[in-house]
């Protein structure tokens, strides 16, 4: 056991996943934070001590809503509140965010899933891909 009593192979798998995604994205981020952002609850249940993305998803959801609201508000000064709300809802919908994860980030192969979720194709589930973007 290492880092917070997580199995060494799980830590290694997470680090390899984070490093591969950082390289693919051509960016630098805190690797431990990226591992957390890519860790599904099912993986953390099988690897006690592993943090999953749920808290980051909570924060990311609020940030996405704020940024999309401000962007739409400034970009469309003639639209009313209802029109802006519809545009924002579409921009931050599961469909839109999972498409970004699938087609732009190619995030599926990097998501750390528990065995059962992985066997059920969790890396391609829209709900999980959406959570990763949030």
Task: Map each language-model feature to its residues.
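RNase III-family endoribonuclease catalytic core
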Residues: 2-133
């Amino acid at each position: 056991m290492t880092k917070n009593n997580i199995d060494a192979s799980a830590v290694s798998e997470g680090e390899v996943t984070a490093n591969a995604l950082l390289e693919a994205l051509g960016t630098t981020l805190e690797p431990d934070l990226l591992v957390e952002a890519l860790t599904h609850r099912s993986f953390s249940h099988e690897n006690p001590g592993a943090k999953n993305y749920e808290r980051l998803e909570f924060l990311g959801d609020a940030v996405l809503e704020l940024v999309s609201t401000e962007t739409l508000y400034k970009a469309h000064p003639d639209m009313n509140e209802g029109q802006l709300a519809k545009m924002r809802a579409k921009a931050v919908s599961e469909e839109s965010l999972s498409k970004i994860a699938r087609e732009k980030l190619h995030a599926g192969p990097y998501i750390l899933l528990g065995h059962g979720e992985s066997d059920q194709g969790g890396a391609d589930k829209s709900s999980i891909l959406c959570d990763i973007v949030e």
